[in-house]
């Protein structure tokens, strides 16, 4: 009798665990599918509705303008770190384990820089004419696109950690990654077409997610082929470079903001 009760209890616990895992997977899928689109579109609406003077005079508007993209990207990095902590890779003492530790350090750095950048962008005065477009479209578009690509490229349940999928997805992934950078270059060059480049990732990300849902390609046996690994390494190196630049800019903004408290009122009024 005790053996039967123990078996039933074990089966009940297993069913409960499977139900919880299914709920978590459903929530994660919903977050990955709609989080990027919502974050990018909301920031763009802020840019279209409010003027430079509105942002410059209201810190709360600046905060809301960058909040959702920053929140989405930082949550993605924390979720990846949580997944990696639950995986078996952290116990490895080989070169693979060292690379795993390096990847986790990079993910933590990305999340930390995202949070610091949000504070810095809120504290900064958006005096330049291009500042609203930079802070509500260019940077959020990259934040969201890069975090999304990492979330679908890292699979800590696999032995290789890296899982890019079928080759048909890679061109879309490269477009999602590179188009915000091209849009930023056009913004710097004062091109009037920069807006369209920032909205493209908001369209491509749901398209890619729907493609994976309704035209499931599965994981190929070549998911860690050298060229796929090169794509991931290129993406990671580019991300480190961009986030290092953002970290430097954020520290400089915060330093100037803190130094402004020591300036006399007459000097502040002239700025």
From Swiss-Prot:
Pfam families with a match to the protein in the record: DUF2463
Similarity annotation: Belongs to the UPF0328 family.
Protein name according to UniProt: UPF0328 protein ECU09_0020
The organism's taxonomic lineage, starting at the top: Eukaryota, Fungi, Fungi incertae sedis, Microsporidia, Unikaryonidae
């Amino acid at each position: 009798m005790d053996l039967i009760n123990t078996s039933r209890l074990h089966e009940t616990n297993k069913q409960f665990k499977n139900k919880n895992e299914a709920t978590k997977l459903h929530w994660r899928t919903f977050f990955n599918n709609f989080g990027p689109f919502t974050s990018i579109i909301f920031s763009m609406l802020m840019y279209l509705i409010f003027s430079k003077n509105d942002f410059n005079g209201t810190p709360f508007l600046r905060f809301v303008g960058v909040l959702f993209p920053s929140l989405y990207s930082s949550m993605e990095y924390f979720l990846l770190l949580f997944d990696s902590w639950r995986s078996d890779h952290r116990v490895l003492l080989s070169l693979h384990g060292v690379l795993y530790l390096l990847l986790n350090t990079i993910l933590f750095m990305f999340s930390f820089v995202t949070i610091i950048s949000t504070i810095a962008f809120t504290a900064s005065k958006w005096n330049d004419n291009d500042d609203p477009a930079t802070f509500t479209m260019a940077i959020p578009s990259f934040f969201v696109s890069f975090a999304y690509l990492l979330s679908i490229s890292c699979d800590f349940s696999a032995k290789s950690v890296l899982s890019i999928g079928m080759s048909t997805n890679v061109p879309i992934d490269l477009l999602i990654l590179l188009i915000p950078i091209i849009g930023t270059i056009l913004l710097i060059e004062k091109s009037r077409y920069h807006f369209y480049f920032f909205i493209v990732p908001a369209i491509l990300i749901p398209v890619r997610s729907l493609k994976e849902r309704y035209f499931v390609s599965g994981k190929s046996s070549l998911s860690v082929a050298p060229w796929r690994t090169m794509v991931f390494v290129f993406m990671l190196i580019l991300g480190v470079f961009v986030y290092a630049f953002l970290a430097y800019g954020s520290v400089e903004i915060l330093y100037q903001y803190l130094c402004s408290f020591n300036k006399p009122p007459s000097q502040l009024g002239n700025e």
